A protein has these predicted regions:
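N-terminal accessory targeting/assembly segments
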Residues: 1-8
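Single, functionally critical "micro-switch" positions that shape active/binding sites
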Residues: 28-29, 130
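Structural motif
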Residues: 31-32, 126
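Short acidic/polar capping segments at secondary-structure boundaries
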Residues: 96-98, 132-135
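The AdoMet/dcAdoMet-binding core of the Class I SAM-like
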Residues: 110, 115-116, 124-125
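Conserved class I S-adenosyl-L-methionine
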Residues: 122-133
Length: 135
């Protein structure tokens, strides 16, 4: 299976820009965010200048009922925005528990579904993705 790299998915409005120091820097369409990545124990690769371009950051707090909260540095659309993967559109928006509304690592599965749907010659079907945790 392909790794989730921009060059493997040129038609995806998502990019994992950097990871390190227990964080990940991600681009969802025009918006950039910092979220926790507990297994990213290595140093960050990009400069602090690049990380400071983030529009928001989600941090965990001990004792907080929700586990954490967002701090936004700029205004993002309250009702979310759309990002594209091939001919699929996903509505995304930061949630109170640190998610954005989709799991980019599911891209190989979406591509598999797209490729198999093409073989059905527009026959109507229903798909249930039981591996895409949605919260």
């Amino acid at each position: 299976m392909d790794h989730l790299l921009a060059e493997n998915y040129p038609q995806f409005d998502y990019q994992l820009l950097d990871t390190g120091e227990l964080q990940k820097l991600e681009q969802f369409g025009p918006h950039r965010f910092i979220r926790p990545a507990p297994q990213a124990i290595w140093p960050k690769s990009l400069s602090s200048t690049e990380w400071k371009k983030a529009e928001g950051e989600y941090k965990y707090f001990k004792g907080k009922d929700t586990g954490g909260e967002w701090k936004f540095f700029t205004q993002t659309p309250k009702d979310g925005w759309n990002i594209q993967f091939h001919n699929l559109f996903f509505k995304v928006q930061p949630t109170g528990f640190g998610h954005i509304g989709l799991f980019p690592e599911q891209a190989p599965n979406w591509l598999w579904i797209i490729n198999h749907l093409k073989q059905l010659n527009d026959k109507e079907i229903k798909v249930l993705n039981i591996f895409g945790y949605t919260g």
